[in-house]
């Protein structure tokens, strides 16, 4: 996606350890026009896919997932990183965050993810694939089906995409970062 790649090159910032900061247009302050274009592209790429639910994990995946859900006229469910006291009937799994260097127990209500659901997972980043693996676990525990996974940015050098594709999962990434060596952003 050309507009996204140009924006990453113009406004993205690189930090040691393979961190790409895009908080000025994707995951802290958001550019709603760009986010709409991102959602339109995901909808185009998954147009022939049988989906009845869009899913993400809080917090940075919520905006693109809502835009995709809006365009597809489908409900959006996000896995929570903290169990609400009001949630009784839930599925849980553990997810390691590369950026925050810690693990979270994430949960989703069985009322919103269940057998027969055909899920499209949308998130901001794909690095090592840990969040994606957690979502796969939740989907499997629910008896639902994972129809595909869409990521705004994939960091190819961290191989999460390789893992998912080798597992037979359909992965669509709108911008693929080949390298952040010497803090130079190289996009495929």
From Swiss-Prot:
- Major site of localization recorded for this protein: cytoplasm
| EC number(s) on file | 2.4.2.22
Catalytically driven reaction(s): XMP + diphosphate = xanthine + 5-phospho-alpha-D-ribose 1-diphosphate
Record keyword Cytoplasm present: yes
The residues that the entry says bind xanthine are: 20, 27, 155
Binding, 5-phospho-alpha-D-ribose 1-diphosphate? 127-131
Q: Which UniProt keywords apply?
A: Cytoplasm, Glycosyltransferase, Purine salvage, Transferase
Any one Pfam family here would be Pribosyltran
Q: Which one of the record's GO molecular function terms can you name?
A: xanthine phosphoribosyltransferase activity
Q: Which Gene3D superfamilies match?
A: 3.40.50.2020
The record's subunit annotation is:
Homodimer.
Q: What PANTHER family has UniProt attached to this entry?
A: HYPOXANTHINE/GUANINE PHOSPHORIBOSYLTRANSFERASE, XANTHINE PHOSPHORIBOSYLTRANSFERASE
The UniProt family comment states:
Belongs to the purine/pyrimidine phosphoribosyltransferase family. Xpt subfamily.
What does it do?
Converts the preformed base xanthine, a product of nucleic acid breakdown, to xanthosine 5'-monophosphate (XMP), so it can be reused for RNA or DNA synthesis.
What NCBIfam families does the annotation carry? PRK09219.1 (NF006671), XPRTase (TIGR01744)
UniProt-recorded name of the protein: Xanthine phosphoribosyltransferase
Q: What is the gene called?
A: xpt
């Amino acid at each position: 996606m050309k507009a996204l790649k140009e924006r990453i090159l113009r406004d993205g910032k690189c930090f040691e350890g393979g961190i790409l900061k895009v908080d000025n247009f994707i995951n802290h302050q958001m550019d709603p026009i760009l986010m709409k274009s991102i959602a339109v592209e995901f909808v185009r790429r998954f147009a022939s896919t049988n989906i009845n639910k869009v899913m993400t994990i809080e917090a940075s995946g919520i905006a693109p997932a809502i835009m995709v859900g809006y365009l597809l006229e489908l409900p959006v469910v996000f896995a929570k990183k903290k169990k609400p006291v009001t949630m009784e009937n839930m599925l849980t799994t553990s997810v390691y965050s590369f950026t925050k260097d810690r693990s979270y127990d994430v949960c989703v209500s069985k009322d919103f993810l269940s057998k027969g659901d055909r899920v499209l997972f949308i998130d901001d980043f794909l690095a090592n694939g840990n969040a994606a693996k957690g979502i796969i676990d939740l989907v499997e525990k629910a008896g639902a089906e994972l129809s595909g996974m869409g990521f705004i940015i994939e960091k190819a050098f961290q191989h999460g995409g390789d893992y998912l594709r080798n597992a037979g999962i359909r992965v669509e990434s709108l911008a693929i970062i080949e390298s952040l060596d010497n803090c130079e952003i190289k996009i495929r």
